[in-house]
Amino acid sequence: MKATGDRTKVPTGDPDPCSVSARITEEPIQTDRLLDLGSRADGALLLFVGRVRDHNEGRSVARLRYEAYAEMAERELEAILREAADRCEVTRIEAVHRTGELEIGEASVAIAVASPHRAAAFEASRYVIEEIKKRLPVWKREAYADGSDAWVRAASDGPPR
């Protein structure tokens, strides 16, 4: 499943609207591309990268798998980004979430925010990751070092059926 992506201008109360991009993808996240975000007017460029860690709740994790209905997840991710743009003075905000099989250390989510000021960039980034954790319809299945696996609580009420 390839990323569909969306680039939408969002009114933020300023004469120049914020540009928003939300993507769900099976492809590795190119974090270096996200560092090109923003313009010369931006004093802050913040990049948050969430990575697959080797443990969770006392268990050794070997890898994990994210599953999602990509179109629905992208719509919700875009809504989250729009909310962040409305709340914070940012000029560009982009988020990418992986699906598929991920190994330890791989980027599972990336959020890039460009803003004239650092406080707004930090606020927007924090808002986006917290809302992703609460609301994004993406399911996670952890594979453990002992050979077992389990669905892990995600934003929705349960694993895909």
Each PLM stretch: what is its role?
Residues 1-108, 114-126, 130-161:
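N-terminal, polar/charged subdomain of small-to-medium soluble alpha/beta proteins
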